């Protein structure tokens, strides 16, 4: 295991955030401007639209924009008609053109207006589009240089989506601050006491950390050869992994990359997950979770997919309880007019400490 306190010479008492940081509206607005609008801004994966004509609306934006694959590649277009500002496409599918259902205004797959019925002179308008960066198929529209940020990432090859397909997307709303989500995600101290299923699937005794200026990575091993499932849900997941791999142990139990402030890319046996946080207020966070599997599994192994999804969501609900308890306690302290912070457990909470240090640096806080 690595020790971040030694590696970065951080002083724990100076990096923890006061309880007010999780509820302050003015600070929240500053976070949106400094961290999110100037961050990497992940919008989706190219596997969402594998074929020409494929489209996939952005769930996090109430379908206000859409990923479209045209003959030139993948583009991010506005999904709002230039006539009466109606949402045009819903969900995912394939189309030759983008047609507004209200008045049949029609755009090509590059967003150019092709036709506006009953207009003597066609309006000179088009759908707005955004420039995209591509890293391992992940698409970003932000101002950061994503390739530079992740250039030294040691697990990049493990996060290779070649041969994978998008299976489904979960939208999960959380009743707590986005920073609390990241804190829970970046500490392994709670895995054994609070996650009976996950705690018997992965081994935090094998925890290793990797840190970059804008990211951290946790890698954990497989627990006891998957011989002792902790819950009935995880029993099915253990069985699915062992069956698909013919009894051979996977390389890892899990790999969890956090690209600050809000993008998480996760490796599990024969699974890749992209999870993105979208703050909706100091006490509300939307998590959009994309599940990718090898093509063979998506097409022929539904039991594997359902077992993994159920295990993932079981742990997700448990994490919700942790985060809700943390923010409830912080709110109680805030109302009492005080603030308290505790020490970091190293190495299991090194990631949380790294996040706090990053936050203070970028926010100048």
Curated annotation (Swiss-Prot):
Enzyme Commission number: 1.14.-.-
Residues engaged in binding [2Fe-2S] cluster: 81, 83, 100, 103
Cofactor detail note: Binds 1 [2Fe-2S] cluster per subunit.
Keywords recorded for this protein, A-Z: 2Fe-2S, Iron, Iron-sulfur, Metal-binding, Monooxygenase, Oxidoreductase
Record keyword Ribosomal protein present: no
GO molecular function, one term: 2 iron, 2 sulfur cluster binding
Class of the enzyme per the UniProt entry, highest EC level: oxidoreductase
Swiss-Prot/TrEMBL cofactor(s): [2Fe-2S] cluster
Alphabetical list of PROSITE patterns matching this protein: RIESKE
Positions of the Rieske domain: 44-141
Keyword presence, Iron: yes
Parts forming coiled coils: none
Disruption phenotype: Deletion of the gene abolishes the production of 2-hydroxyputrescine. Depletion of 2-hydroxyputrescine has no discernible effect on growth of the deletion mutant.
Function summary: Rieske-type iron sulfur protein that can catalyze in vitro the 2-hydroxylation of putrescine, forming 2-hydroxyputrescine. May be involved in the biosynthesis of the cyclic hydroxamate siderophore alcaligin.
The protein, known as: Putrescine 2-hydroxylase
Protein species of origin: Ralstonia nicotianae (strain ATCC BAA-1114 / GMI1000) (Ralstonia solanacearum)
């Amino acid at each position: 295991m690595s020790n971040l306190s030694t590696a970065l010479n951080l002083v724990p008492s100076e990096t923890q955030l006061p309880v007010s940081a999780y509820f302050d509206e003015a600070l929240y607005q500053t976070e949106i401007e400094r961290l999110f609008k100037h961050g990497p801004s992940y919008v989706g994966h190219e596997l969402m639209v594998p074929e020409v004509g494929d489209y996939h609306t952005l769930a996090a934006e109430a379908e206000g924009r859409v990923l479209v694959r045209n003959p030139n590649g993948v583009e991010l277009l506005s999904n709002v008609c230039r006539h009466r500002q109606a949402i045009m496409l819903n969900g995912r599918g394939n189309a030759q053109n983008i047609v507004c259902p209200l008045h049949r205004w029609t755009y090509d797959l590059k967003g150019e207006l092709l036709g506006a019925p009953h207009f003597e002179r066609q309006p000179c308008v088009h759908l707005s589009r955004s420039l995209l960066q591509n890293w391992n198929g992940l698409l970003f529209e932000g101002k950061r240089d994503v390739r530079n940020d992740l250039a030294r990432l040691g697990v990049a090859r493990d996060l290779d989506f070649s041969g994978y397909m998008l299976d489904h997307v979960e939208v999960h709303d959380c009743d707590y601050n986005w920073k609390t989500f990241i804190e829970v995600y970046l500490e392994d101290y709670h895995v054994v006491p609070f996650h009976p299923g996950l705690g018997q699937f992965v081994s935090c005794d094998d925890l290793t950390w990797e840190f970059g200026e804008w990211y951290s990575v946790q890698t954990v091993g497989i627990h006891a050869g998957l011989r002792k499932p902790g819950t009935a849900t995880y029993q099915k997941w253990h069985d699915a992994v062992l069956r698909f791999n013919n009894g051979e142990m996977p390389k890892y139990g899990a790999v969890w990359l956090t690209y600050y402030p809000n993008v998480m890319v996760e490796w599990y046996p024969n699974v890749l997950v992209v999870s993105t946080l979208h703050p909706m207020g100091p006490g509300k966070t939307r998590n959009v979770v994309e599940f990718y599997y090898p093509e063979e599994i998506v097409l022929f192994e539904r039991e594997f997919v359902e077992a993994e999804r159920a295990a993932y969501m079981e742990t997700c609900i448990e994490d919700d309880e942790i985060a809700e308890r943390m923010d409830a306690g912080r709110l109680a302290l805030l109302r009492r007019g005080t603030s308290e912070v505790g020490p970091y457990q190293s190495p299991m909470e090194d990631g949380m400490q790294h996040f706090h240090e990053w936050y203070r640096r970028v926010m100048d806080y």
